[in-house]
UniProtKB/Swiss-Prot annotation:
Physiological role: Required for accurate and efficient protein synthesis under certain stress conditions. May act as a fidelity factor of the translation reaction, by catalyzing a one-codon backward translocation of tRNAs on improperly translocated ribosomes. Back-translocation proceeds from a post-translocation (POST) complex to a pre-translocation (PRE) complex, thus giving elongation factor G a second chance to translocate the tRNAs correctly. Binds to ribosomes in a GTP-dependent manner.
Protein's recorded name: Elongation factor 4
Topology of the protein relative to the lipid bilayer: Peripheral membrane protein
Domain tr-type G: 2-184
Length: 598
């Protein structure tokens, strides 16, 4: 065990984590030159296209150090986006040390702070790595000062590297050997392993990633899941190099994967402790903090027979990503679908895109919403995230909405516009300070979550030309003036368009959606009325005029009463059509109507 090192790479988005992982794999000959690709650990197409890491990945490397000894390094590459911070927490719990990667041209950013504090909470030894030193804008001395002043870590021994060119990579590997501690554990003790992650493999079935704390995990061993006492027999044991390599056992301090012919996805709960059936350990390891979704939306298949396939796809994805939730629901307008909960808007987009790509589904998603706490006149407290579950306004006593504490780092020249954006989103400023001797402002704001989840991050990046960074965490619930905005098309309610908005925005939002629907719904033979209502009161209306068929075209001259008779007959026909005709709203109309901020 003295020759094992478990470490994670943590950083803000785009500071070069995955590129550094590529260079470490290359240096340790993890893959042959012809097998190397950029972002080799980002296995999903969507990760490579967006240039982001979504799933934390693990890889075992063998490295011969300058002291002549051969070391086994278990590397975890983690995501940097705030939506995927739970992936970072899980990876850190399986390691003893962290490489803190900072872009030497950008400096310390909001997620750098959030992730380094997580590492400190896990008692990690931290090695500071300043990346991109080959860039003309690189300023390592300024960034070293920032690290000491903001984070409070001594940066005199920071390693200067360029993950792109490979400069300084060997120094990083030597620092991992000399500065990071070896894992603690007893090989002779009863088996005690923590379940770090799980996913579905089409060939192997359910695959579980484990970190063995004590004892030895062997092929053929009968294991017990301590959360529910489910018993399974281990079929395969392996490690990632980053290719799958089968092995016969994993001993204390090692990270690897196992398969055990699991049938129930509920049996592989992330954070659970695995032990041996014959010789169980005395107690379970402390698990991970439960994470709860904060953004909800409904997803419906566009094909009538798509519900069954959507359920199967969600179940398989849920195995790979336990952080989102889903439950079946039905809509008058869109049929059968699922109400899903996510950790943020990027998480929602990624899951929807994976469903469409990996499972070839055609989907419609409704407007995102957060969880509101509603206290009724009778004193009952309800948690509402679906607008159609909101009680009538006369039955509501108080509505409370979630607020967050946001940490925003922004260059001084964009500060005014960012402050205006936060105020426009009903924010309350808590603190404004400057980072060390730099021209970077550190803002602390309290903001309603509903104002942040939609397009706040995009607006923040767009105003600051990409330089601002954001990190946030749920703070508390506060009383708020909330309306349920409903829509009627020809007097019929369209439940899929309903949304929950702040009172100050309801009329403006109603007008926007009505205007969009007017342009999106095809014209009919009769007039179509589109109305937005709040508590039974109409706040906005648009009308789609009918096609006009010229029924008098065949007449020439003659008595005017003949013309009047034909027009009267047309009017009666349209009236009859209006009373029985259902307006067919195209699926893309729902998507376009609910788009925000464009």
């Amino acid at each position: 065990m003295d020759n094992v090192r478990n470490f994670a790479i943590i950083a803000h988005i785009d500071h070069g984590k995955s590129t550094l992982a590529d260079r470490l794999i290359e240096e340790c000959n993890g893959l042959e030159a012809r097998e190397m690709t950029n972002q080799v650990l980002d296995s999903m197409d969507i990760e490579r296209e967006r240039g982001i890491t979504i799933k934390a990945q693990t890889v075992r490397l063998n490295y011969t150090a300058n002291d002549g000894n051969r070391y086994c390094l278990n590397l975890m590459d983690t995501p940097g986006h705030v939506d995927f911070s739970y992936e970072v927490s899980r990876s850190l719990a399986a390691c003893e040390g962290s490489l803190l990667v900072i872009d030497s041209s950008q400096g310390v950013e909001a997620q750098t702070l959030a992730n380094v504090y997580k590492a400190i909470d896990n008692n990690h030894e931290i090695i500071v790595v300043l990346n991109k030193v080959d860039l003309p804008a690189s300023d390592p001395e300024r960034v070293k000062l920032q690290v000491e002043e903001i984070i409070g870590i001594g940066s005199s021994e920071s390693i200067l590297i360029s993950a792109k060119t490979g400069l300084g990579i060997r120094d990083v590997l030597e620092a991992i050997i000399t500065k990071l501690p070896a894992p603690q554990g007893n090989i002779n003790a009863p088996l005690q392993a923590i379940l770090v992650d799980s996913w579905y493999d089409p060939y192997l079935g359910v695959v579980i990633l484990v970190r063995v704390k004590n004892g030895v995990l062997k092929k053929g061993m009968k294991i017990v899941m301590m959360s529910n006492n489910a018993v399974y027999q281990v079929d395969n044991i392996g490690i990632f190099t980053p290719k799958k390599v089968m092995t016969s056992e994993l001993s204390a301090g090692e990270v690897g994967f196992i398969t055990a012919s699991m049938r129930k996805m509920a049996d592989c709960k992330v954070g659970d402790t695995i032990t041996e059936e014959k010789k169980p350990c005395g107690e379970a390891l402390p698990g991970f903090k439960e994470i709860h979704p904060v953004v909800f939306c409904s997803i419906f298949p566009n094909k009538t027979d798509g519900f069954k396939y959507l359920r199967e796809a969600l179940e398989k994805l849920h195995l790979n990503d336990t952080s989102f939730t889903f439950e079946a629901e039905t809509s008058n307008a869109l049929g059968y679908g699922f109400r899903c909960g996510f950790l943020g808007m990027l998480h929602l987009e990624v899951i929807q895109e994976r469903l469409e790509r990996e499972f070839d589904l055609d989907l419609t998603a409704t407007a995102p919403s957060v969880i509101y706490e509603v206290t009724t006149q009778s004193g009952e407290t309800l948690n509402i995230h679906n607008p159609n579950d909101m009680p009538d306004s006369v039955k509501i006593k108080i509505v409370e909405e979630p607020w967050i504490t946001a940490t925003i780092m922004v260059p001084d020249q964009y500060l005014g516009e960012i402050l205006s954006l936060c105020d426009e989103r009903r924010g309350k400023q808590e603190d404004l300070s400057y980072v060390g001797n730099t021209m970077t402002a550190l803002l602390k704001y309290k903001l309603p979550l509903s104002e942040v989840v939609l397009d706040f991050y995009d607006r923040l990046k767009s105003i600051s030309k990409g330089y601002a960074s954001l990190d946030w965490e749920i703070s508390n619930y506060q009383e708020s003036q909330i309306d349920k905005l409903s829509f009627l098309v020809n007097g019929e309610p369209v439940d899929a368009l309903a949304c929950i908005v702040h009172k100050s925005r309801s009329e403006k939002r109603g007008r926007e959606i009505c205007a969009r629907l007017r342009d999106l719904i095809p014209r009919q033979q009769y007039k179509i009325a589109i109305q937005a209502t709040v508590g039974g009161k109409i706040v906005a209306r648009e009308t789609i005029n009918p096609y006009r068929k010229d029924v008098t075209a065949k007449l020439y001259g003659g008595d005017v009463t003949r013309k009047m008779k034909l027009l009267e007959k047309q009017k009666k026909g349209k009236k009859r059509l209006y009373s029985v005709g259902n307006v067919d709203i195209p699926h893309n109309a729902f998507i376009q109507a609910l788009k925000i901020g464009d």
